[in-house]
């Protein structure tokens, strides 16, 4: 650790101490809030660790914990307030992410630098958000995610309006990163808005066009939570006992989840690559005789409940379908949508990007450098974003 790093570290500790002692930084607005300061400290250190171009951006962060209907605990909210801003961007995190990531803050600073305030939310697939039962049972289900995001935003504006008067009068725009970008695109196509906020623009950064990525992450979480053992070659692999344990966990998760599905949600499963996770669950549970009840549940309750009913063989055949983009397939994007995408993003194939580019035309900017979201650090990105957002009439940037 070099001297400059040490100096920055000690400065951050000093600032954290000062900020944590200031009630205006993290004022709990929910009764019986047990942990007002640890998250404030964490958010401050994270913000300082990001090499912001403008110190004013770092110091503008205000962190709240907001009570949202249906949530078991307060929702963390990051608010970068830009004095005099007439428009606020709601920025949605990527799959399982929160606004404390450097990429999130790089994008937030770009918005802030151009004269916008930024309201940051954790991903609907992150535990901080998924305390609402439906998100917890089915992460990645866009209709439920968007409904809960809309309700959360309405509650956030209502609860913070007294402390942040600008949020009661501001205009609004919606932006998202990765999975949050997919939610942004879906919201731009919604016939009925999910929030009372009326978004004037939608900006998506690297939207993954295939939900199978998110669903595979869900499956992997079961495996990572299982005990592993060392092989003679020194690698860690799941033991048979851990596989059985993972199978039992899957059995409990999927049986409880599927039992709560409506007909509309079951049709959603058929339309998306989510079905592959179900097939993997069937495969894993078949290793343990105690899990046969889950297979029985699928065959006797789930599959016959579909209209028309499906056999297990017919269900398995569905994995060969090649249409993972159903919700975004038929309706052209409105002119208020802007997409930035990295050509070497691992979450979307060249075919996907070409398909999206064809539908968006000049509304889409492609970048080759930097890897997944690495382009957010480039001068070209800053310039393109500034030019693209100029119709929203922000204040001049610093």
Label each residue range with its predicted role:
Residues 333, 339-341:
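Short beta-strand/loop motif that positions the catalytic acidic residue
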